[in-house]
UniProtKB/Swiss-Prot annotation:
It holds the Pfam family Defensin_beta_2. Belongs to the beta-defensin family. GO terms for biological process: defense response to bacterium; innate immune response. It comes from Homo sapiens (Human). It is found in: Secreted. Disulfide bonds join C41-C55, C45-C64. The gene is DEFB107A. GO terms for molecular function: lipid binding. InterPro entries: Beta_defensin_dom. The lineage of its organism: Eukaryota, Metazoa, Chordata, Craniata, Vertebrata. Keywords: Antibiotic, Antimicrobial, Defensin, Disulfide bond, Secreted, Signal. It comes from the Eukaryota. This is Beta-defensin 107.
């Protein structure tokens, strides 16, 4: 039985790592989309910036862009 438990723990750890990798890939993809929209990912948009979307990363959830001056 100890061999089966070691395999189970190894498989569980591998699944957790895979879940983290796929989340990171999505965050990188959203950051690239924000760059294409001429924005940047920040924790909070500054007063002279407008929120144009979400980066959905833990530390930088908003995609911010400078407001256009009329």
């Amino acid at each position: 039985m100890p061999g089966a438990m070691k395999i189970f723990v190894f498989i569980l750890a591998a699944l957790i790592l895979l879940a983290q990798i796929f989340q990171a890939r999505t965050a990188i993809h959203r950051a690239l989309i924000s760059k294409r929209m001429e924005g940047h990912c920040e924790a909070e948009c500054l007063t002279f910036e407008v929120k144009i979307g979400g980066c959905r990363a833990e530390l930088a959830p908003f995609c911010c862009k400078n407001r256009k001056k009329h």
